[in-house]
């Protein structure tokens, strides 16, 4: 998940540098969503993950 977030962030930065406003906004929004989903899944796996015997 974090990899996809970083990929979308890089796409957004490149698009912003080249002046593609709509594409940069879309990629930045997608990066934020993927990042938040990744954090939520990490926290869920942290609390429900490996149990001690």
UniProtKB/Swiss-Prot annotation:
Localization (cell): Cell membrane
CC per GO annotation: plasma membrane
Keyword Transcription found: no
InterPro entries: DUF1328
Membrane topology value: Multi-pass membrane protein
Keywords annotated in UniProt: Cell membrane, Membrane, Transmembrane, Transmembrane helix
Keyword Manganese: no
Transmembrane regions listed in the UniProt entry: 4-24, 30-47
Any Pfam family: DUF1328
Similarity annotation: Belongs to the UPF0391 family.
Protein name per UniProt: UPF0391 membrane protein ECA0470
Lineage of the species this protein comes from: Bacteria, Pseudomonadati, Pseudomonadota, Gammaproteobacteria, Enterobacterales
